[in-house]
Amino acid sequence: MAHFQQTMNNKVIEAGMGRNSLINDLAQRRVYDNAVEELNHRSRRPRVNFSKVISQEQIIQATNAYPEFEITFYNTQLAVHSMAGGLRALELEYLMMQIPFGSITYDIGGNFSAHLYKGRDYVHCCMPNLDIRDVARHINQQDTVSTYLARLERSKRGLPVFQQSAFNKYMNDPDAVCCDKRFQDCSYSAGLPGKTYAVGLHSIYDIPADEFGAALLRKDVHICYAAFHFSENLLLETTSAPLDEIGATFYKSGDRLSFFFQNESTLNYEHSYKNVIKYVCKTFFPASNRFVYHKEFMCTRVNTWFCKFTKVDTYFLFRGVYTRGEDSEQFYTAMDEAWEYKKTLAMLNSERTIFRDRAAVNFWFPKVKDMVIVPLFDGSVTSGKMKRSEVMVNKDFVYTVLNHIRTYQDKALTYKNVLSFVESIRSRVIINGVTARSEWDVDKSVLQALSMTFLLQTKLAEAKDQVVLKKFQKFDDTVTNLFWKQISDAVGDLFPSIKERLISGGFVKVAEQSLQIKTPDEYITPADKLVMEYQATEELQHLDISKPLERAEKYYNALSELSVLKECDEFDITQFKNLCEEKDIAPDVVAKVIVPIMKNELTLPFKNPTPEALSDALSPLPKDLDMRFCLLKLSTCAPFPSVKTLDSGLLPKQSYGDERQFESQSVVSVSDFHLKSVESVKMKSMSSAVYTGPLKVQQMKNYMDYLSASISATVSNLCKVLKDVYGADPESAEKSGVYDVVKGKWLLKPKDKCHAWGVAELNNGEKVIVLLEWADGFPICGDWRRVAVSSDSPIYSDMGKLQTLLSCLKDGEPVLRMPKVTLVDGVPGCGKTKEILETVNFDEDLILVPGKEACKMIIKRANKSGHVRATRDNVRTVDSFLMHLKPKTYNKLFIDEGLMLHTGCVNFLVALSHCREAMVFGDAEQIPFINRVANFPYPKHFRYTCLYHREVRRLSLRCPADVTHFMNSKYDGKVLCTNDVIRSVDAEVVRGKGVFNPKSKPLKGKIITFTQSDKAELKERGYEEVSTFGEINTVHEIQGETFEDVSVVRLTPTPLELISKSSPHVLVALTRHTKSFKYYSVVLDPLVKVWSDLSKVSDFILDMYKVDAGILXQLQVGSIFKGENLFVPCPKSGYISDMQTYYDTLVPGNSTILNEYDAVTMNLRENNLNVKDCTIDFSKSVSVPRQQQEFFTPAHRTAAERPRSAGLLENLVAMIKRNFNSPDLTGILDIEDTAELVVNKFWDAYIIDELSGGNVTPMTSDAFHRWMAKQEKSTIGQLADFDFVDLPAIDQYKHMIKAQPKQKLGLSPQDEYAALQTIVYHSKQINAIFGPLFSELTRQLLERIDSSKFLFYTRKTPEQIEAFFSDLDSTVPMEVLELDISKYDKSQNEFHCAVEYLIWEKLGLNGFLEEVWKQGHRKTSLKDYTAGIKTCLWYQRKSGDVTTFIGNTVIIAACLASMIPMDKVIKAAFCGDDSILYIPKGLDLPDIQSGANLMWNFEAKLYRKRYGYFCGRYIIHHDRGAIVYYDPLKLISKLGCKHIKSLDHLEEFRISLCDVSSSLNNCAYFGQLNDAIAEVHKTAVNGSFAFCSIVKYLSDKNLFRTLFNNGSSTKG
């Protein structure tokens, strides 16, 4: 062991010293990969062309300044100030990059032609002509557009597609593109929804800073991005400030600031110096008494400063959540309007806070770091006046000079000596023959003035020192005389002038016998200078507040009068003030009118003018209105102020009793359903009905129809089960069950027992509904023949609810009551249940909840103190309340999770409870009511509850801070939390569902899944047994519950609509925990992206709960050419290593798999398999020894496996994968009616109108001869030997496996043992009978298909596919949809068979043969003679059936036709379980995921792409047509196959690959092919080098043989 450890240490040392070549190679490869990845990332940046001629240094400078762009320097245009002109385009693109693409944008002083070229039709340019230069510039912009159009016309080309919208807008409405008004005066308004933005490129100088905020607010600008030139030297008392990087200069003269380019003769730009300083120094710009625009610097690049102005609502100050209209103190807001002015004054005085931070100043003014401002003095010989200026000098330089010259003797302290020293330390010196550059770079032009300043400061400092020293001595003369004597000795003849200047300048003050010397400041910091400038330019005037106070007094008097109203705290003060100002009416007059209206003293027909109230007011009067007036006894002490508030003809009671009067005298019981004919229950149509009455009544009618549709679908399916069941099968346990009353046994045994009702078949064949009673697991039956039950009939809840609602109708109409309904819309964990328990009075109120568990939880929490308050009478489930009404009225009704209910159900609950007030608690962003009856119409406007009032709760008591941050993107208003946990969300992407095991992969806390299939699989793996919470639930099942720790698991690799960032299921899953949340997923999905985003948010942001997201959009450029595919021969180059590199890049790690002995390991190790009911002959478990087949060894490494041998374990694993554990996602579905509807849609969508009618008999002599011509003699011989006495067993199938495993193009082969594909097939006799039949039916179907629009990929060549897609118009905006379905064959159930049979019926399938075929595909038995396995399957698609391929194709086409408007589809193709659709861009589509789940039982994934992928081929559509490329990755994977037996076999393999990949010989569209591959494989790189290598090896027979090593055992 010691020797082994020493060897390991030596190898590590060798690797560190570079002597290990293997490690060095790996390091070099890592560097190469990083470089390639970085270059690829850089190539994806937006491209900008820089045509101006600039120097190499300027090129480097521009490239470093704008790393966001891919800049191409052409150097083809000579121009004045080339650098600044070229940078202007970069600056504009940088500003526009900050704005979400398509958002309304105002370009202040912009160049409209630049936006036209980019196709930005959403930008409006304000281009005022403030001087002559502006007029000339605008004319030049128009000329450039004309030149561009002329160049296109000369080359006979049209405008690119992305520019057409902008140019059309300029042609039709040029004022919408640009105007000649100032931004402050611009009258243009886009009138479109969404946020508004603005940009200002070197243009905000000309807008007064005091008007800037108001101008932005007038346009409702959300954020304004601006760029302007500035120099730190402008802060000094200097006249010029150069901008060397762009060759420009600022010149200051008083308040006039000029800007001009050096070496250029043109007009100067002139601005106000004070205005520019305000933009630099102010931190916010007031826009109104509420809104301000806060300025933030973004960056400085090449003498250009970038900043943004963000609109800020000051009402958010010191408040976490902004609320309106619910605070009673708002009545006094009008009195305090004067405080708004004081607040504005206070905010203005605090604007300089950023400049008190020295670090902040140095950051935004990088050139002032370690600099000081030194005064300079310049005198005039002629006038005798002196002028003062300032300069910025290095602080170290100043102190070096001052410290040195203070050491001079008095005689040596002269101006010449000081100047000599300053010049010496500034200039270059030679040391030992080497020139050394000075440490300080001070301008030589100011050295003389600086020397004079230094001399003067030193003289005054020495005089001050002498005075201090002589204070300790006694002198005969005064201090003043001593001081002047000292100065006179120092300056000599200049003494009179110096004395006068020192006194007048304030440096020396003389008062009687006292002397005060003030030494000048050696310097001031730029921060102090900046504050001084700001104070000098921002003087505030006193405000006249007499008028606001007078106006506030009027509003106060009016609001005092309104305060007598009930619930006056909900009065909207803002709307009241707007009404008074718009109508110019005195507030007290309006108040005197509002009070009688709100007290209902004017007998108006409604209280509030809502659409619902108007509908009630305009609806017909009740028929019994006269009778109600007769029954009514009026009195002055009546509790109700007006007649209209009475709900019925009975006077209300003053207390809450136990009686309630129903409108209908006859209450129908559920028992009336017993022995009722099924025809009276089944709905004839599910089409949309037209409802009448107010919206609430329409919702209630729709809910009753929903219950009827649910019962109808269940009854219809039970009738179908009775019709389909013939023989007995007591062993299987399915969803449905059929009991034979005569025989007293189950023909079809159900999983569950004790169903509440079912459908019975009488002796005369009539079918009726029966209510069941049970004894010893068997139903107690009458004089019936058979009884059918299903999993949809365990209880009669829908029946009970429907009968209760029918009993409460008045003249066939629901009785509508109008209590106050309040929606409490709260975020997860806001304490909705807690609020209910704290508010409810259990003696007179009622609580209703959707489920039993929630009901138990509320009762438990209410009674936890020991005092029993909550019972089964005042806390009930919704179903219990509707099924068992009790004669009692309630004061308040509380509905928990009310938004999960049908809105009509909520209205019924409110009406039947006779409550005075209803509180509906829910969350509008969580899972809503789900319509589980396929094809039942539930209109969108029915989904909104009619409310009297809405309250919001935005404080979560449950969720941690990171989850609260996520919720802020979902809810209006700010969401807060009280949880101390900051970070709780974590995620882990596992390599496959095979890693989940309770021992090796324990899950913490509550285990949750998104789908029922994942839930079932985790149960089978044993997680429910070890979980601390016991049961595993789906997200939908645990909405409203709370847990400390949560583990969410996703085992389904296919994309799910449930898991998207906008899905309510994701929100529910993320908000169930209080401490920790961990997400385990087998794929990268949006929830993993949410975790990734949350992990990047800083703790500071989490405290603010703010979401900031941007939208990036890439401009697409189309072409205008049409014609045939351009052909460019592909070069035959490259090596096998190129294909290997490409394969490893797209599927990293697959080539390193050692799977040669996986099958052996599988047979030797202990395996746990989830097997359904089957019979296994274990004598087959030991395979017969056989001689091992030798195969060629590929030189190319892939994840391909060798062929496997059939055996018990191998075949069983394949059967489990392909046939067992089928999904069960279907909702309530009326199979026969829905199948008929789907087939009608299929016929309307795909069949040509002229061929849509009339059935053609397929079994004709012509059809038989066509079939015979294509058959082998052996097949005909089988028919000749068949006796035709009886048909073979049509429901018996044989089972076998394919020896070669299917290669997967993902990473799953690294973690999973791939199951083999199975073949389930009939006997040859059955195929000989039904083969020609369905072949003829298929031919007739394909002849009727509209082949110009739809492609059914049967008997088609790759060239025909290419021809089908060649007429796609690339100029039409469109997108590609791909619906891919996992577990496609075994997901097909009874509904799919019904759809397929109806299609064959329309084509003329014989009735007897159809019935035989049905029975052969209902309940079937599988026998695998090789492995000794026998099992039973219900429905499912059989892989070796005569209808497998065409049946799968028809089903996928029917599925899409039932969900997508096929008349809007441009092109569509179907093949087996693959499909592709080309649809117009922006087409509104339904929820395809929900439809595929509930109706079709499919686990579907919907892809939206630019390029199509169909049957292993990429469809590249371009401006000349389309070309179809075989998937290169699949092709390379096949080159690593391990099943080649001989050279002849190898040559056949090469020829087959050449046939499918012939299009790769054309390399003209390899660029688009790379883009298409990148959509599928995120790690893809440009693979043109690999494609060339493929062509090279496939085209050469001898070269292709080098890809495989036949070894010594291979025989030709």
Swiss-Prot record:
It holds the Pfam family ToMV_Hel_N. The keyword Nucleotidyltransferase applies. ATP binds at G826, V827, P828, G829, C830, G831, K832, T833. CDD domains: Virgaviridae_RdRp (cd23251). This is Replicase large subunit. Belongs to the ssRNA positive-strand viruses RNA-directed RNA polymerase family. Keywords: ATP-binding, Helicase, Host-virus interaction, Hydrolase, Inhibition of host innate immune response by virus, Nucleotide-binding, Nucleotidyltransferase, RNA suppression of termination, RNA-directed RNA polymerase, Suppressor of RNA silencing, Transferase, Viral immunoevasion, Viral RNA replication. Residues 822-1080 are annotated as: Helicase. GO terms for biological process: DNA-templated transcription; mRNA modification; RNA processing; symbiont-mediated suppression of host innate immune response; viral RNA genome replication. Residues 50-452 are annotated as: Methyltransferase. Residues 72-280 form the Alphavirus-like MT domain. Residues 954-1112 form the (+)RNA virus helicase C-terminal domain. GO terms for molecular function: ATP binding; ATP hydrolysis activity; mRNA methyltransferase activity; RNA binding; RNA helicase activity; RNA-directed RNA polymerase activity. Residues 1374-1487 form the RdRp catalytic domain. It catalyses: RNA(n) + a ribonucleoside 5'-triphosphate = RNA(n+1) + diphosphate; ATP + H2O = ADP + phosphate + H(+).
